[in-house]
Amino acid sequence: MEEKSEDCKVPEDLFNGLKVADPQEGESASPMVSDPKGQHCQSKLPKAAEAHPQDDHVEEECFHDCSASFEEEQPGAHVAGSKASDDSSSELDEEYLIELEKNMPEEEKQKRREESAKLKEEGNERFKRGDYMEAESSYSQALQMCPACFQKDRSVLFSNRAAARMKQDKKETAITDCSKAIQLNPTYIRAILRRAELYEKTDKLDEALEDYKSVLEKDPSVHQAREACMRLPKQIEERNERLKEEMLGKLKDLGNLVLRPFGLSTENFQIKQDSSTGSYSINFVQNPNNNR
């Protein structure tokens, strides 16, 4: 029994030897040795204790917090990452706003609308100065603030943000914003026209033509839409012919690869189009070089 008690004292002596000599640091040193994890947990407790008294305030202002976090998560350098996060955040914000409005007082809605209008004007000023990234940020904050019941206001904000993104060559996200603006206000000609321009720049000519036609239906005096409706059909036809030639070229290469082991090529198969019906016929030619 005595030997066991002496063995038990060894860790205690070692423990005492590891203590810091400074009496002011003695209390903080002993828990570091006895339980390193405990110190880690204790370091978090004051933060939690400080945050706890503000829980009610945070819950009340969570809408503003979402706006702040959205702004912080939009670094200009992260192009691919920011696009995905911006889009998903906007979708969540729309749903969140609708849920929030169920119990929101009318005064609060008007207050948020006024704050959103200020942010929009701030974005407009930044856009005029050429600060397109900052303008995009202001419009995003305004969208976070503006209640979903004010659909026309939100439609303008989406269209404005699309313009800011368009200036930064963020064409796909700009198209998404235009589509949201049109969804909220189907008669919003500026958003439709802006999306048509973006479709044309991304070589989506069919979609662009449809939007230009939609603009003319709503306002026949828009010269840009009328000119595009005259110009795009020919471009679409030329593009389709080019794509058809590319496809036939690829099929020809594939055919030559298959026929080569048999001593044949696609030159042995001549394709002729019937001018009256537009249909094609294929004729086999044994010596295609002799027929030229």
UniProtKB/Swiss-Prot annotation:
Keyword set, alphabetical order: Phosphoprotein, Repeat, TPR repeat
Chain intervals for the UniProt region annotation (Disordered): 1-125
TPR repeats: 116-149, 155-188, 189-222
Compositional bias annotation for Acidic residues: 88-98
SMART domains for this protein: TPR (SM00028)
Highest taxon, organism lineage: Eukaryota
PTM sites of type Phosphoserine: S90
Pfam families hit by this protein: TPR_8
Gene Ontology cellular-component annotations: cytosol
Basic and acidic residues bias spans: 1-12, 47-64, 99-125
Transmembrane segments: none
InterPro entries documented for this protein: TPR-like_helical_dom_sf, TPR_domain_protein, TPR_rpt
Entry-linked Gene3D superfamilies: Tetratricopeptide repeat domain (1.25.40.10)
Oligomeric and partner information: Interacts with the GAP domain of NF1. Interacts (via TPR repeats) with HSP90AA1 and HSPA8.
Protein name: Tetratricopeptide repeat protein 1
